[in-house]
Amino acid sequence: KKFSLVPGSEMLGRVSGLLPYSGKILIATRYNGLFIYDGETVQKFNSVADSFMQHNRVFCAALNQSLLALGSVQDGVCLLDLEKDEMNVISINSGLQNKTVLSMSFDALNNLWLGLDNGIDCVHLSSPVSSLYGNKPVIGSGYSSIVYQGKLYLASNQGLYTTLPSTELNKEIPMTFVPGTGGQMWSFLNYDGKLFCASDNGVFVIDGDKMEHLDGIKGVRSLVPLNGRPDVLIAGTYGKYSGLHLLKKVAGRWQPAFRLKNFTYAAKSLMAESSGNALWVTNKDRGVCRLILSDDLQEVVSLKKYNHSAFPSGYDIFLTQVNSETVAVSHYGLWRYNQATDSLEEYHELENMLDGKAAYSYLTMDMAHNIWYVSGEALKLLRYDAVKNTYSKLPHDTFLKGSLIENYEHVNVYD
């Protein structure tokens, strides 16, 4: 057999990869970009990745359908969609151990495995979680987020920040600090066309580009509306202000009205029932309580605690709704409210779909009925198939292990 030079290939320089693509051969070069060989001629394949390839010394390449991965010596991996001509760079600021990629391969689950200069990384390309800000601690510790009037608001231990929601994965986006909000921010409520922000310093109300600080209330952890009462909100507070406070809309302005009588506990997790004047409140010491408020909302007229020997207090408990059921997420597993017996019962059905009888610290169901939850110090995902009406877990649906703030986790699926 005799080897012969492919006509026109002199311009390629050093070749980093030969890949089958649409019945032809896609050629990745070290510095000169991409080319296509159709069996007769070599032609330049122009793409948005040309500049990346010219400046970062492409060492290897892999192809998965129309997704081309280019491993570089100087700046990690360039992911190029050959059909859309869109690219994304994954490097140290996206979580790689180092920038030098010497080999790569896609697996059967479409994950990209990288052989680095020192170590091996796996990029979960099908993961629903990606970094907005790289590895940089841009805004300190995060506690909550919400999209309001086209802007993404982020609550942190440093105050309130805002930016535009990003549609590009693993791309750092600029942050703007909201002046006057320095300190611990806890949670948000989009209500009455306004954004209510709960914080150590009380409640901030954002209305478009304007912001107002409500005087007379401090240490606010969360805010909830009451069914059939559009002119009031209940604020759960802690510390020296522990208890429940009522906010009232008067002449178009929201303002603190009074502190409810007969309840002086810290309110870490707060949830209102869809009818009546019933509230669920949790804290570490008191456990889970269901409160009934008076018709004039001046006081708590009934309080029942739901902890018992198999479900003791002493740990933080998170309240959530799963398919219209009230669920307590705890160190002792998942418990749901049985209205017929007025008790919390073990939620074996849901536990069996998740991690069994385990310690859970967070759980939420998104708009597509997927269930996000935290156990074993990691965020996990139970996927819902609307066509089959079934739930399933993928092997790599475990994220951010060891990076979460226990009992203060938050997931906001906004798109």
Q: Residues of each region from the PLM?
A:
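Carboxylate-rich, polar loop motifs that coordinate divalent cations or form catalytic acidic clusters
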Residues: 1-415
